[in-house]
C-alpha cells in the first residue's frame, strides 16, 4: 500500500496516512520527463487503487460512462462515487474504502431495509443506508464514527450518527469528488 502511495501521491480512500515530503522529492528527481502515456497510466492507477477496482471493473465503468450523456470523465467519477463502499467511506462509517468493502461483505449494512453484501452496489438518490440491528454491527460503526475526523460532509449525503443512518440526497456534484485526477 505504501509503495503505491509513494508512487502515486496521497490516496485518501486507501489509507489516512500521507507520504513523506522527502520521498516525493526523490521520486521526481529520479523520474525525469513524464510522457503523456505515463501521465495517463498514473491517473488510471490512482483511480483503480483509490476505489479498489480491478482492471476489468474499471473498463466496465468507463464503457458505461462513455454511453452516458455528458463528459465521460465526470460521469465516470460520479459512477465511482455513488458506489456503496465509497458512500460508507464518505459518511465516516468506515475509515478507508477497503474497510467499507469489508463491512458490506460481512453483511453489516442495510440499504432501504435490505441486506446488501455487494460493495459495488450503485446507490440512488433517496437511498437510506443503515446498520443491522445487531449489537456487533452497531459497535463497529460506532467505533468508526467516533474515531473518524469530522470532515465536512458532501452535500449529497446526510448522516444521523446516533441512529447509524445515512441518506443519499442526490447524485454527487463534481466539486465534492475527493480525488484529484488530471
UniProtKB/Swiss-Prot annotation:
Cellular component per GO, a single term = small ribosomal subunit
Q: Which GO terms describe its biological process?
A: ribosomal small subunit biogenesis; translation
Q: Which Pfam families match?
A: Ribosomal_S4 (PF00163), S4 (PF01479)
Q: Relate the assembly described in the record.
A: Part of the 30S ribosomal subunit. Contacts protein S5. The interaction surface between S4 and S5 is involved in control of translational fidelity.
Arranged from A to Z, the UniProt key words for this protein are: Chloroplast, Plastid, Ribonucleoprotein, Ribosomal protein, RNA-binding, rRNA-binding
**GO MF, one example:** structural constituent of ribosome
The identity of this protein, by name, is Small ribosomal subunit protein uS4c
